[in-house]
Amino acid sequence: MIQPQTHLNVADNSGARELMCIRIIGASHRRYAHIGDVIVAVIKDAVPNMPLERSEVVRAVIVRTCKELKRDNGMIIRYDDNAAVVIDQEGNPKGTRVFGAIARELRQFNFTKIVSLAPEVL
């Protein structure tokens, strides 16, 4: 469960290392975001000499959460960290690689490009 002021790791090579959620896209007073939700975030830590810089406002899709994800078949998936992938206005990832495992549910939300870049889909 991601809410405003939550710090997330970045799971791609876009140049950002850490994000802080400032708004959840979708509803006017939505409190929490889960896997597959789009958030507005600010970059808190970035790699030097990359296109994305610190204190830049970006959109990101959540790919991993510490909070459990329960599937319809009863399987429960939990990750060790909260992570997101930086995207552009069309929903395409800004990076060319994705690190770590990605949930299968992202395919339902039309983030197929992120799923295809991921090394492991759970």
From Swiss-Prot:
One of its GO terms (cellular component) is cytosolic large ribosomal subunit. GO terms for biological process: translation. Keywords: Chloroplast, Plastid, Ribonucleoprotein, Ribosomal protein, RNA-binding, rRNA-binding. The keyword Ribonucleoprotein applies. It comes from the Eukaryota. CDD domains: Ribosomal_uL14 (cd00337). GO terms for molecular function: large ribosomal subunit rRNA binding; structural constituent of ribosome. Its main location: plastid. The keyword Metal-binding does not apply. It is found in: Plastid, Chloroplast. Belongs to the universal ribosomal protein uL14 family. Part of the 50S ribosomal subunit. Binds to 23S rRNA. NCBIfam families: rplN_bact (TIGR01067). This is Large ribosomal subunit protein uL14c. It comes from Guizotia abyssinica. The lineage of its organism: Eukaryota, Viridiplantae, Streptophyta, Embryophyta, Tracheophyta.
